[in-house]
Every structure is written in structure tokens, then in C-alpha cells.
Amino acid sequence: MYGVILDKIDYEPKLIIRDIDDRFQYKISYAKAWRAKQKVFEMRFGTYEASYDNLPHMLSAIVQRNPGSAADTYIVPSLDGGPGFLLRAFFCLGACVRAFMYCLPVLCIDGTFLTGRYKGTILTAIGVDCNKQVVPIAFAFVENENTESWYWFLERVKIHQ
């Protein structure tokens, strides 16, 4: 079932229940099917926690592989001297920054809330080209939409434009 679940990203727990019953004549609960799907994704892609831990490394790889790209993180130090925790992450791709030179001289900014396991806000800066097409410029993951996080984001957008 591991391969089937991976092949069908939108494989719903109710379909897992049906397929287990058809294949093995065994009934499982919805909760068990949900946990099985989560476990398969963790085995293949890692945990949510590991993804957040790897974010600074992934951003570094983006900057190294994409000329003109930029990234920054804000990590809050731990009180006990251990590793801190990621509070904010910013990135912009070099190609998008260069494309902004050909956009209308207006920068549109917006934020939207994350509603999954980890809360927070995604802040975005976009431009509009002469064909009225949206050009993404920069993104940031922040703790919430407040004056301090907006200032942090816009300061980085200004530096990297």
C-alpha cells in the first residue's frame, strides 16, 4: 500500500479503508487510515519538524543555485543554549527580482494565514508586468501578521531589489 499511497497524493482515508477491505478483507478505522497515510508521507518526505529544521539549508541551496537570489532567516536563540527555533524566513529568486525591473513601478504586498499543523503567515511581494501578469518577487514565512514582521519583510525586499 506504501507505493499506492505515494502515487496518489490525494488518496483519501476512505479510499484506503475500501482498498484494504477489498485486498485483505480487513476493516480499519478512518483514524487508522489517516495515520497510515501520514506515516507513509513521513517515511518518504520526512516529518514537519525536520522540514522546518532543514529550511535554512534549503534556502542556502536556492541562493547557491540561482544567481541573484537571496534568503534570510531569523532564528530565536534558545534560553538553555541549545539550538534556537526558526521564527522567520525570507527568500526571493534572482529571476523574479530581475523581472521586476520590467514591471509597472508598483509593488503589491499581501499576507495570508497558514492553517495547517503549524500556524503563521506567508507575506508576499508581487509586481505586475506590462501584460498585466503577476510577477512574484519575494516571500516570507513569519510568526504572524504584525508591524514588526512586516517591517522585517519589507526591509529585506528593499535590500534585495
Task: Annotate each language-model stretch with its function.
Residues 1-161:
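DNA-binding interface regions
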